[in-house]
Amino acid sequence: MASTRVLASRLASQMAASAKVARPAVRVAQVSKRTIQTGSPLQTLKRTQMTSIVNATTRQAFQKRAYSSEIAQAMVEVSKNLGMGSAAIGLTGAGIGIGLVFAALLNGVARNPALRGQLFSYAILGFAFVEAIGLFDLMVALMAKFT
């Protein structure tokens, strides 16, 4: 609590001393008041130490951390790669689906060779649906990586 009061009063006095809108008479009065007061060397040392601590604290409070952007960028890249990998797992499902469609075609033609043309057209239609799902999954995976 006391450190907050010290920080606030110190910042206010620094702003008043460095403000361009302050009248020169006010600044002279503040400077002369400080120069007239004399204290022991210990008090002067404490005052300069406190000023340096306050300045360091305010600098640290408003300073941007150098490593935060690098960590954030690395986390974004890891997330993109995980998203692409997770979405690419769906491509194996499309490959399995295409294999099952043509396995069913071969099984159907083996059971009833007379329906070969009709079964082949249904197999091509099933292949197109499964491939569309696979391409959609690939598109999602690439969007997760490159956007």
Curated annotation (Swiss-Prot):
Pfam families: ATP-synt_C. InterPro entries: ATP_synth_F0_csu, ATP_synth_F0_csu_DDCD_BS, ATP_synth_F0_csu_sf, ATPase_proteolipid_c-like_dom, F/V-ATP_Csub_sf. GO terms for biological process: proton motive force-driven ATP synthesis. Its main location: mitochondrion. GO terms for cellular component: mitochondrial membrane; proton-transporting ATP synthase complex; proton-transporting two-sector ATPase complex, proton-transporting domain. It is a multi-pass membrane protein. Keywords: CF(0), Hydrogen ion transport, Ion transport, Lipid-binding, Membrane, Mitochondrion, Transit peptide, Transmembrane, Transmembrane helix, Transport. Residues 1-66 form a transit peptide. It comes from the Eukaryota. GO terms for molecular function: lipid binding; proton transmembrane transporter activity. SUPFAM superfamilies: F1F0 ATP synthase subunit C (SSF81333). Belongs to the ATPase C chain family. PANTHER family: ATP SYNTHASE LIPID-BINDING PROTEIN, MITOCHONDRIAL, ATP SYNTHASE SUBUNIT 9, MITOCHONDRIAL. Mitochondrial membrane ATP synthase (F(1)F(0) ATP synthase or Complex V) produces ATP from ADP in the presence of a proton gradient across the membrane which is generated by electron transport complexes of the respiratory chain. F-type ATPases consist of two structural domains, F(1) - containing the extramembraneous catalytic core and F(0) - containing the membrane proton channel, linked together by a central stalk and a peripheral stalk. During catalysis, ATP synthesis in the catalytic domain of F(1) is coupled via a rotary mechanism of the central stalk subunits to proton translocation. This is ATP synthase subunit 9, mitochondrial. The gene is oli.
